[in-house]
């Protein structure tokens, strides 16, 4: 048990709380401590009955059963693996910026879920984070099942197809990929690659709550040091290789 505790405490803070909630909420529903009917995102209940907790519980809940258990475990692994890599890589020392990314993606997913009557939001949020990681490491070669190897930029779409095979749907994965692309475009590609303005900015109260560590940069739209060095070497303009500044290690 001490080994499990040590492993759990080694997970970076934001990923640790997200991971714990994604384990605890399905367990609560499975044990019947709270009826799963209160954990789904139902637009009518949220909008007209003021059951304001539903967007939160729907983000962590997943109906685990004989037909869904494997899909749940696979996505739980994706959450742990890629959120940890983002939090300790591109967002290292900047917990407020990482939390803001999660909040931005979550709000977009909730709005989409209400519009499209999506009852579960766990997979879309996980996929949005995985998509951002894949774009920041787009030229890294990753390994998938059965020894297949390809560039990281294709990983979200490979997983979309994989989840379709084992789960029978692609809507959740597609929404997650699109939301992740929206964040990546507004945060990195548009201001840094296309010379546009910054549309995203982490609120100051998040910096007061989660101050940057080790001299981390405050404020979105300012690239991590490794990307700035790559841009400087390319003359500070034009297109550049997104993956080189964000390699987080070999898969």
Curated annotation (Swiss-Prot):
Q: Which GO terms describe its biological process?
A: cellular response to misfolded protein; endoplasmic reticulum unfolded protein response; positive regulation of protein ubiquitination; proteasome-mediated ubiquitin-dependent protein catabolic process; protein destabilization; retrograde protein transport, ER to cytosol
Q: What membrane topology is given?
A: Multi-pass membrane protein
Q: Which UniProt keywords apply?
A: Acetylation, Endoplasmic reticulum, Membrane, Phosphoprotein, Protein transport, Transmembrane, Transmembrane helix, Transport, Unfolded protein response
Give an example GO molecular function.
identical protein binding
Motif SHP-box: which residue numbers? 241-248
Record's SUPFAM superfamilies?
A: Rhomboid-like
> Which residues are modified to Phosphoserine?
201, 226
Q: Indicate where the modification N-acetylserine is found in the sequence.
A: 2
Residues modified as Phosphothreonine are: 202
**Disulphide bonds in the chain:** none
Q: Which residues lie on this side of the membrane: Cytoplasmic?
A: 2-15, 90-94, 138-154, 190-251
Which parts of the chain does the record assign to the membrane side Lumenal?
Answer: 32-69, 116-122, 167-170
- Which residues does the annotated region (Disordered) include? 229-251
Transmembrane segment boundaries: 16-31, 70-89, 95-115, 123-137, 155-166, 171-189
Where does the protein principally reside? endoplasmic reticulum
Query: Which Pfam families does this entry report, sorted A to Z?
Result: DER1
Q: Name one GO cellular component term.
A: endoplasmic reticulum quality control compartment
Indicate where this protein resides in the cell: Endoplasmic reticulum membrane
Q: Which family does it belong to?
A: Belongs to the derlin family.
Subunit-structure text:
Homotetramer. The four subunits of the tetramer are arranged in a twofold symmetry. Forms homo- and heterooligomers with DERL2 and DERL3; binding to DERL3 is poorer than that between DERL2 and DERL3. Interacts (via SHP-box motif) with VCP. Interacts with AMFR, SELENOS, SEL1L, SELENOK and SYVN1, as well as with SEL1L-SYVN1 and VCP-SELENOS protein complexes; this interaction is weaker than that observed between DERL2 and these complexes. Interacts with NGLY1 and YOD1. Does not bind to EDEM1. Interacts with DNAJB9. Interacts with RNF103. Interacts with HM13.
What is this protein's function per UniProt? Functional component of endoplasmic reticulum-associated degradation (ERAD) for misfolded lumenal proteins. Forms homotetramers which encircle a large channel traversing the endoplasmic reticulum (ER) membrane. This allows the retrotranslocation of misfolded proteins from the ER into the cytosol where they are ubiquitinated and degraded by the proteasome. The channel has a lateral gate within the membrane which provides direct access to membrane proteins with no need to reenter the ER lumen first. May mediate the interaction between VCP and the misfolded protein.
Q: What is this protein called?
A: Derlin-1
Q: Please tell me the species this chain comes from.
A: Pongo abelii
């Amino acid at each position: 048990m001490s080994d499990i505790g040590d492993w759990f405490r080694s997970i970076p803070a934001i990923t640790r709380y997200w991971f714990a909630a994604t384990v605890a909420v399905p367990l609560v529903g499975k044990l019947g401590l709270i009826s799963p009917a209160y954990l789904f995102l139902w637009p009518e209940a949220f909008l007209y009955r003021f059951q304001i907790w539903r967007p939160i519980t729907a983000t962590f809940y997943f109906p685990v059963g004989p037909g869904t258990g494997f899909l749940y475990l696979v996505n739980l692994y994706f959450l742990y693996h890629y959120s940890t890599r983002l939090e300790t890589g591109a967002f290292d020392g900047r917990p407020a910026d990482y939390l803001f990314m999660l909040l931005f993606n979550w709000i977009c997913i909730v709005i989409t879920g209400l519009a499209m009557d999506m009852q579960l939001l766990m997979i879309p949020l996980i996929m949005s984070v995985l998509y951002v990681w894949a774009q920041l490491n787009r030229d890294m070669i990753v390994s998938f099942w059965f020894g297949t190897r390809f560039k990281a930029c294709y990983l979200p779409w490979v997983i979309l197809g994989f989840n379709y095979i084992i789960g029978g749907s692609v809507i959740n994965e597609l929404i997650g990929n699109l939301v992740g692309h929206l964040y990546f475009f507004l945060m990195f590609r548009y201001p840094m690659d296309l010379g546009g303005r910054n549309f995203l900015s982490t609120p100051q109260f998040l910096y007061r709550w989660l101050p940057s560590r080790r001299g981390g940069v405050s404020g979105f739209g300012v690239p991590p040091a490794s990307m700035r060095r790559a841009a400087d070497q390319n003359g500070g303009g034009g297109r550049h290789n997104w993956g080189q500044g964000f390699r987080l290690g070999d898969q």
